[in-house]
Amino acid sequence: MPPADPVTLSFKTTGGVTSEHGNMNRPNSTQDTCTPAPSNAASCPFATQAPQPAQAPQPEQSEQTASTAWPPGPAPGLMGWGLLRRMSRDLLGTLAQWRGEHGDAIHLRIWPEHQVVVTDPELVRELLVGQHDALVRWEHGISVFAQLHGHSVLVSEGQPWRSKRQALLPAFSPKAVQAQIPALAAAAQAALQAWPQQSEDFPMEQALTALAMDVIMRLMFSGAIGEDARSAEQAIREVSHAAHSEFYWPLRWPDAMPWKRRKRRALAWLRSFIDRQVRLRLAQADAHWPEDLLSRLLRLHRGDAQAWTLQAVRDECMTAFLAGHETVASSLTWWSWCMATHPEAQQQVADEIQEQLQGRTPTAQDLPALRQLGWSLQEAMRLYPAAPVLISRRCTRPVQLGPWRLPARTLFMIAPGLMQRDARWFPQPDVFQPQRFADADKDRAPAAPRGSWMPFGTGPRVCLGQHLASTEMTVVAAMVLQRLRLSVPEGASAPRPVLQVTLRPSTPLRLRLQSRRGAQTG
């Protein structure tokens, strides 16, 4: 039985929803997200859907009824397997349709579970911030991730999670990240020097992924990724494909099955790759260890070998390597597509970069001045979040969510990909408009609840590496546009987003490159 196909994401948005927060109707735009100026460029893959009225709880509902009823949702059919099949084929498209039909809280009865999908920012914050101590991550989802991540901070719970996060936090603080900017810039410069100055059909996604891998390798292991980049990318794609196909079904076939040979090989390659880095470092004298993440983890091991076993060190290295480059590579890939399909916005950003940097490599002092670049990255992450759906949470005790009193063991699914394309919070939600973040900076934007833009999550489990990811994306993007003009190749079609742990194009993105006259190349 071969694994299921990767999930296609429709991102069909709904507008004009009336919620418990009042009537927030705004018309949806029918304009394309990424319609490029050149006639040869393809239209955006995300089409809007006509709004449908939500069915929120009625105000006259009695307190007793509200405390016991589930939110509205689709009919489960036979044990809910039909719902599960629809979600596995088109997750966000299906969730968007259900939100249009049932509102911002959707009850799914998939035997033996009760699951509530939450797409309202205030309700999401109520859960992930206000009631975080009542939530644990979904056991099945964690078991899928644990195949590769072991017992790292990504999958741990309770006191083990708190201890690991506290130990790792200093390495990802804003101050620590700022000190790493020269290494980020050096990695970007080395990669860009190998890129052609002119190409009609450049493998942009592959190049950005290799660059992001190289950066995290330098920060973690003080060495370049080198010839391992291509093998690592292939192994990660295979493991991600397998993990995503296993994510939706409660039972999975053992890895020993013949059709899982590629998954076994990919897992073995990645584990061997990380183990090799650890063994090489342990072979060096402690006094010669560089100041990087691996050295920090090994010092924790030397200080408390029971709490920080060598396997725990390997687990954290695996998570840092995978999470540390996947979000950046995914986000930069979609940003490059948005830039290629919006030449005027691209030129404005490039002009700002030239004005601020004058051909120099960016430093920590330069980054705050690159505001238009920052807005373009924020808008690309709004349209194409690397994690459009968060790992489901289970409540360990009854929780109050809006008007509903939900019992212990209820599962909650959070969908940032829907909230970030909601016309109530983002007018013309399918249109690439970096200026909306400029207006937010100037307090001119319509009041949008906190959490309506959350590409890194929110609450105590917010992404540990968000400062590193944001800084790396800014440095790399600035250096790309210093040198190159991006456009869509002749006859190319728009990329189709698929979710395989992170959001990626179904086929690797390729762009046309042109050198910018007078650009820095050294």
Annotate each PLM feature.
Residues 5-15, 20-53, 57-154, 159-163, ...:
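N-terminal membrane-proximal hinge/A-helix region immediately C-terminal to the signal-anchor transmembrane segment
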Residues 414-444:
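Conserved cytochrome P450 K-helix/beta-meander segment immediately N-terminal to the heme-binding cysteine loop
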Residues 16-19, 25-39, 46-48, 63-71, ...:
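Cytochrome P450 heme-thiolate monooxygenase catalytic core
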Residues 67-78, 181, 185, 234-238, ...:
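Cytochrome P450 I-helix active-site segment
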Residues 83-103, 272, 360-402:
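Conserved cytochrome P450 K-helix E-x-x-R motif and the immediately C-terminal K′/meander segment
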Residues 343-345, 466-503:
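Cytochrome P450 heme-binding "Cys pocket" and the immediately downstream C-terminal segment
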Residues 149, 163, 318, 323, ...:
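Cytochrome P450 heme-thiolate "Cys pocket" and heme-binding signature region
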Residues 327-340, 476:
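Short, small-residue alpha-helix embedded
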